[in-house]
Amino acid sequence: ALFYNQIKMANDILNSIPDGTTDPTLLSYRGQAKAIRAFDYLNVAPYFQFKYKGNEEKPCIPLVTEEMAADPNNPRATVQAVYDLIIRDLTDAINDLEGYARKDKSEIDQKIAYGLRARANLYMENWQAAADDAAKAMAGYTPYQRAELTKPMFVSSDESGWMWALEITEADYNADNSLISWPGVIGSFCEGSYSAGVGMYKSINVLLFNLISDTDVRKGWWVDENLHSDNLKGQSWRCLASGDDIATLTVANQGKAAFLPYTNVKFGMYGGLGTNAAANDWPLMRVEEMILILS
C-alpha cells in the first residue's frame, strides 16, 4: 500500500503543476514527484515478474500516471513498459532538479535521481549506464571509514555516506510506540521493544559467522559464541552495564533479555543504547551502494 499511496500522491502533484512551467519551486516539486514515482514502481515491479532481461514482454504491474483518467480496466503492463516509464521519469527528474538545493536528506535532489537511475539501469543490466549514473550520484559523498564501523552505528542521516533517508523524529517514534519501530525490531538496543524486550533478536548462525574473516570489520556486528564483540567496548546500556556485560544484562518487566550467540550489535540507538525513543533515521540510499554499482 505504501508504494501505491505514494504513486497516487505523485500523480496528484504532477496534475497540479502547469505544463511548461519554468518556476524553480514547481520544477523541484515535479522532479521529486517523478523520482518518487519511479522509485515506487522500481520497488513494486520485481514482486510481480522476474528480472528485466529476458522477460521484457511478460506482464508485470498496471501503470497509473497523471495523464490517465480513472479506469477500472487497466491491465498489467509489460516489464518493458514499466521500466520505460521508470527511466523516463528519472530522466525528467534529473533535468527538473538541475541546480536544486534540498533542505535536508529527506528530499530528492539531482544526485539522488541519478542514483535511482543507476539502480534501474543495474536491474536492466545496462552496466555502463548504471556505472555512469552511479559516478554522478556519489560525487561529493564519503563512505564510512573503518573506525566508524567498530561500534553500533547506522542511526542518523548525518553519518558518513548517507545520501537519502527518512529522517525520523521523536514525534514519529518514541517510548510509546518503540515496539513497532525499526530499531525495536531489527536492532538489539531498544529497551522494551520487540527484539530486546522478549529476546527476539536478529542473528546469524555459526556457519555464516565462521565464514567472515577475523580481519573483516563486519565480524564485530555480531557477538560470538561467548557473547563477545569488540564493538561493545566503550558502550553502555543506560549505565546499567557496559562492554560485554551488555550482552548478559537483563532488565525486568520485558525491558531486556540476554543476548543469544550471534545476536547482531550492528545498529546503534538514538539517544544511546537502552533508550526507547526509537527515532533512528532510515537509510534509502548510501554512497557504498553507488561504489558497488560503479565497480
Residue ranges and their predicted role:
Residues A1-F48, A77-Q80, I94-Y100, G274-W282:
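Conserved, well-structured interaction surfaces
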Residues R30, R37, V44, Q110, ...:
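Structural register within alpha-helical repeat arrays
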Residues Y52-E66, L179:
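Short, flexible, mixed-charge acidic loops at enzyme active sites
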Residues A131-W282, V287:
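Hydrophobic-face positions in mid-chain alpha helices that act as interaction patches
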